[in-house]
Amino acid sequence: MKVCKFEKIKDEDEMKQVINCIQKEHPYVAVVPILAQLQEWLQAISISWFHEEDEVSHATVNAIEAYCCTLANHLITDSHLNQEIKNRILECIKKIHILVEDKADLLIDKMIKAEVYGLSSDLFTYCLRQQGLRTQTLDTGKLIQINLERKPDIPYIQESIQQYIDENRNVDIFIAPL
């Protein structure tokens, strides 16, 4: 099973380079980091949220939405796929707005981060779908399990991965968030 892992992706041009590399290398799993700008905004949300600056948090969430929609418009020209990713963006942004309404705590902060990491991965997934590849975002939450000692349960993880692969034989490439 071929796996490609990518480092920091700063902008749209680097995103295009990663997509081209994935098309050339054709890995079974491509591990992509969150886009650098989204990472910066996640930090800004955490800081403003923990300081109870709700307006700043919501404004930052809106900036994430605008940025993702702009990327979608530039990179995903197929109208059907563009609409699908925009629906995903709006769904994610709505969830995040609801989450930042709650009182700040670490669990909710992790949920916000998970949403944005997933959204970043989904942008790559849809870009590759536009190129004709059957691509799916890898739901890593289904695969990871810790044992009673709070360590990864390797036998469970191996079994889960094999089952996941068997269930998704029609997928060319999985995109995994880093």
Q: Which residue ranges define each predicted feature?
A:
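Nucleotide/pyrophosphate-binding catalytic subdomain
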Residues: M1-L178
